[in-house]
Amino acid sequence: MYNHKEIEKKWQKIWDQSKAFKTGNKSDKKYYVLDMFPYPSGSGLHVGHPEGYTATDIIARFKRLKGFDVLHPMGWDAFGLPAEQYAISTGNNPNEFTQKNIATFKKQIKSLGLSYDFDKEVNTTDPKFYEQTQWIFKELYKKGLAVLADIDVNWCEELGTVLANEEVLIDKDGNKVSERGSFPVVKKKMRQWVLKITNYADKLLEGLEDLDWENSLKLLQKNWIGKSTGTKVKFALELLDESIEVFTTRIETIFGATFLTISPEHPLVEKIVTSENKEKVKDFIKEFEKLDDRQKADKNEKNGIFTGSYAINPFNQKKIPIWIGDFVLLSYGTGAIMSVPAHDKRDYEFANKYGLEIKQVIVSKENVELPYLESGHLINSSEFNGLSSKEAIEKLNQYVEKNNLGQVETFYKLRDWIFSRQRYWGEPFPVAFDDENNVYLIDGLVELPFMENIKPSKNGQSPLFNNKKWLYFEKDGKKLTRETNTMPQWAGSNWYYLAYILKNADGSYEKLDSEEAKKRFKKWLPVDLYIGGQEHAVLHLLYSRFWHRFLYDIGVVPTKEPFQKVVNQGMILGTDGQKMSKSRGNIINPSEIVDELGADTLRVYEMFMGPLTDDKDWQVESIKGIRKWLERVYRLFEMFFDGQKTIEKSNEDHLILSQYNKLIKEIENEVELLKFNTAISKLMVFVNLLYKVEKIPSWEILKNFALILSLFAPHIAEELLEKMNQKQVKDQIWPTYDPTYLESNLTKYVIQINGKVRAIVDFELDKTQEEVLAKAMQIEKIKTLLENKNIIKVIFVANKVLNLIVK
């Protein structure tokens, strides 16, 4: 009888004691398979976690069996706001319950039979870990990539910290609030550490080309960087001795510019708004300020308001109105655009909405509807008429530069990265200041001091500012004050995949710039497969790629990119098809599933639900079906153990061996392609075949079936191997298939009696009815069933079915 609790507990203990998943160091073939490490929340694992973790585990187990040295680690992204807020509300220090949460997560992960090497475990709150985070920051500072700047930030007084745009939401009343806690957020100028990621924009774009990522994922990164090469052009103001600089990527359409649109934040707004429009513009800007940059850029409906002023088109001297648009960002380009409604979809909709002129300046050979967005030849463009779009771009850019109207430039949407948080629970900066605010880098580790009161202040000072004993120190006779801000949660996750490589079994780390580190990085980098949620598709990957490319540039790592292949698993939804949440009451607890049905059942079910990258609904009956299938597998093996089925030659050998060899080949292909659901389907088909036959030619078939099964259901597989007196999976190799069985000219005949399947037999293709019938009559089971019966009719379907109707 299949007792999952007994079997799973037994094998988890054996694996733990024997360090079965220790990182190999014997092969010249390596495979580094990585999960996006979790934030250890108090609620523990949810059923979404095992989906990605099981996928990487299957690959890790497969590669070990294929003779690879495998690095498959796990760790904890344990700094950050959630733990700190909980600590403040309960009056505790966040470290204590963070460690408790980690212990819970670790126990749950081990209960799933995941083959992590926990000697490689990392924790971002470990001083030995963040000492190296601090080292990277110091190197960034030395190269001018970490700077202090007075900038506008999203300030949340209640949380007492600056928030990234991604951490700010708009509530139902249109007000900015924090994602965590829904507290009010305002714009405030503060001095912050900033990392100059924009210096790496081109390198980050170039690096995408050679990566094995989905195009959609690459596109997300490209769009976030947002590189545009175009032309800056000055439009003189009609009534002021000033000009507005616009940025356009389509200079060839400038004769069709019928109005300008500027950002509500543009510095010229106050000067150019006429008195009769002031109040309306003021109200418009007030609504605009409620949005963050992401919401401004993503707005479907584009709104605007006329300033009352005009600019002069420098190419045709025509007077055109200046509008303010809520879709124009000051942070991109110049904060002003020339609007060409005949050749831009957004401008076309805007012009129709507000009754503005639409002037076509590009045509193609065919009649086209406006807006026409493709290239063609110029019309209504003075001496440039008749030029192709390509020729016009070159000529118009020459004209712009020759007449001092502007220049060709490249702009990026990417902004430099605000890297400070006014909170306690984060990595301290290895920085101090003297009385004149000169910066001093601190050698070695700056450890986060234990504090009872970690509540943030309302004035922007970090809680660390109140720890005077820690705050001040002397160096070389100078009194210095430590930086009291801490790094954001991103800091540790930027480089943790390197920390796994550096981690030693005794808990220490090799230094990032050591010779031993270089040797290890040469072996293990890049990460071969990285699996995690879609929510990290932009920022985490972009920030990690930035730090990695920097470390490459200073000679620390041997590869330009950290992650060769990235896969975003789909979301597991509730039984109602909705995202799981406490408020909907549709959360599934994986620990309860493991207890009731077993870890192997959960693993196989989550892989069988559908393609790894698709969203999938949880189905209670389906997971019970997987449990029944595992019971069926266990019972099948027992039938061979107790003699109900036997290991000996039979007429069905060729069929069994061809399907067995086909199974090995196909599972190998499916696993390499991450098609785990179809791989499991093939295992199910093979089990059905073994149930239909009474004999198989070799124990090797059962042994290797168990080895294949171990990728998906490792506990039951180990148990079955042990019952066959076979070695543990860690001491086995992946089975090979015999290609001669895959090139067979055989076909399977289903032999039926009165429509019921009684045997499945291999025959050479295109045998006659008489030949098939003669062979069928030699099968012992068929002979027995036909005793004292008369065949009154034979139904024959060539290469498929022989059905004997008897009385």
From Swiss-Prot:
Annotated SUPFAM superfamilies: Anticodon-binding domain of a subclass of class I aminoacyl-tRNA synthetases (SSF47323), Nucleotidylyl transferase (SSF52374), ValRS/IleRS/LeuRS editing domain (SSF50677)
Keywords per UniProt: Aminoacyl-tRNA synthetase, ATP-binding, Cytoplasm, Ligase, Nucleotide-binding, Protein biosynthesis
Catalysed transformations (reactions): tRNA(Leu) + L-leucine + ATP = L-leucyl-tRNA(Leu) + AMP + diphosphate
Record motif 'HIGH' region, residues: 38-49
NCBIfam families, A to Z: leuS_bact (TIGR00396)
Primary location group: cytoplasm
Cysteine disulfide partners in this protein: none
Name of the protein this chain belongs to: Leucine--tRNA ligase
Enzyme class: ligase
Gene3D superfamilies linked: 3.10.20.590, HUPs, Isoleucyl-tRNA Synthetase, Domain 1
EC number: 6.1.1.4
Binding site for ATP: K582
Family membership: Belongs to the class-I aminoacyl-tRNA synthetase family.
PANTHER family: LEUCINE--TRNA LIGASE, MITOCHONDRIAL, LEUCYL-TRNA SYNTHETASE
Subcellular location(s) of the protein: Cytoplasm
Protein's GO biological process: leucyl-tRNA aminoacylation
One MF annotation (Gene Ontology) recorded for this entry: ATP binding
Motif 'KMSKS' region location, chain numbering: 579-583
One GO CC term, this protein: cytosol
